Amino acid sequence: MSAQNSTDPMGATNPENGGATATDLKGKGRAPAAQEPVEDTSMAEDDDDDDDEEDPEEEPEAADDDNMEEIDLDNVIGRRTRGKVIDFANAAQENPADDDDEEDDDDFVEDDNKMDDSKMDED
């Protein structure tokens, strides 16, 4: 037999793919190998040089942002409701709930027949 026409079920090499085995190229869940990206290190070196020059400029700006002014105690609000006992029965009597929702429901008229007639006309 010739070498080109023979098949080796255990993983024959394929001369067209640089000697890669057939199992490397085919199979469930196997994607073709992609070329690895080449990193450009020349830009990274330039960035390092720029960072050294910018560091002294940033330090004085940080000192200007400190505004340590006194806090006006009139603007501080106390403990409003923490620790207070609320009598909900008394609060309900003083502030009755609005019954507007129930009154609005009486005004609503549903037009079921009108919608059914329009559907029959379309057919």
Curated annotation (Swiss-Prot):
GO CC list: nucleus
Subcellular location: Nucleus
Alphabetized UniProt keyword annotations: Chaperone, Nucleus
Residue spans of biased composition, Basic and acidic residues class: 111-123
Biased composition (Acidic residues): 37-73, 96-110
SMART domains reported in the protein's UniProt record: CHZ
InterPro entries: Histone_chaperone_domain_CHZ
Leader sequence segment: none
Summary of the function given for this chain in its UniProt record: Forms a chaperone-bound H2A.Z-H2B complex that acts as a source for SWR1 complex-dependent H2A to H2A.Z histone replacement in chromatin.
Subunit comment: Forms a heterotrimer with H2A.Z-H2B, stabilizing the association of the histone dimer. Also, with a lower affinity, forms a heterotrimer with H2A-H2B.
UniProt name for this protein: Histone H2A.Z-specific chaperone CHZ1
Gene: CHZ1
